[in-house]
């Protein structure tokens, strides 16, 4: 009886506390997602669509990260190495930092200011991130 009770508790816990698996069958972004505004390092507001058009026809990896995210910081050396070994691949970094100042400090602290960086000034919950079911960082999209 104890085993059955334990199994039921484990099953309920796994069901209640499990994360939603993102839908992976999306092949195109919605108009709302592409219209999402992001801020470049020089303060210019662009849509996600404008950023993607700059890399049209090329292999592009979008790295979703934040300076407060330990796993994101640990992944930076690997993405740097991947970038160096594969110059044909282009990288864009989308930050989910809570403030513009945190983002800018993170770029300098982790020495990635020379990369193509953008910040979601509307925060985590925005049309683009909602469309891709972003629920954790780091996340990479190819």
Features from the language model and the residues they span:
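Thiol-based oxidoreductase modules, predominantly thioredoxin-like and allied folds used
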Residues: 88-102, 112-124
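Short, internal strand/loop/helix patches
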Residues: 108-141
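Conserved redox-active cysteine motifs that mediate thiol-disulfide chemistry
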Residues: 64-81
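Bacterial Sec-dependent N-terminal signal peptides
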Residues: 1-24
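N-terminal "domain-start" segment that seeds a small globular fold
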Residues: 20-54, 117
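Short pre-active-site segment immediately N-terminal to redox-active cysteine/selenocysteine motifs
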Residues: 58-60, 64-68, 136
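Short alpha-helix adjacent to the SAM-binding motif of class I
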Residues: 81, 102-109
